[in-house]
Amino acid sequence: ENYSECYHCPGVHPQLNALTPYDLGEDIPARGMWKGGWQPLVGEALTMGLDKGSHERPWLKGMTETDAKRIQYFAVWPNLLLSLHPDYLMVHMIEPLSPGRSRVVCDWFVHPDTMKLANYDFSDAHGFWDMTNRQDWHVCELQQRGTASAMLPPGRYSELEASVQAFDLMVADRYAADGKRTARGWAAGLAPGDMDGIDFSDRQAARAAIAAKLNASVESR
């Protein structure tokens, strides 16, 4: 759930939020056992790292100019998290140990040719995400204690938590074990590729275009 939203980022991750503001970016409509989206790098930031995101590493192969100004996040349910940066891939694996404990393993992947460069230095990215991981783990531990309390009433999802709801629906569907899959919010009727051609420079127009595609998808069933 923590990975699936950035509503907590301004307060918990001020360093991250300065590079990719929590209220910018888009979800990627999806079906199946995954959910994802992207956030734009702002200002002169080139990646997620210390020193305001500056670095001298080349892009990963296949990156476009558009890709190089985005951080893309994908959750492959139930426990694989992929964070694609212009210059490296970060992977989290979450291993449940008990109802109240998990082991989180974080790995970074860089192109072998990049690691051979004379000026290769990954300490900025490693240091940034070590800091961010620890910030997340701390608040997750606090939340775990809070939700275990009988005094805590269930809360509502905000408009910035559609991906959290999608994850929770997946878990609920598995517990129900009736073979049915609950539709996911505004993106329930769209599949990957359905947003091709939408201009995200005008957010209002983009939302209207997505709504039109969603309505057309629902009407065609």
Across the structure, where does each feature detected by a protein language model lie?
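C-terminal catalytic domain of Rieske-type non-heme iron oxygenases
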Residues: E1-R221
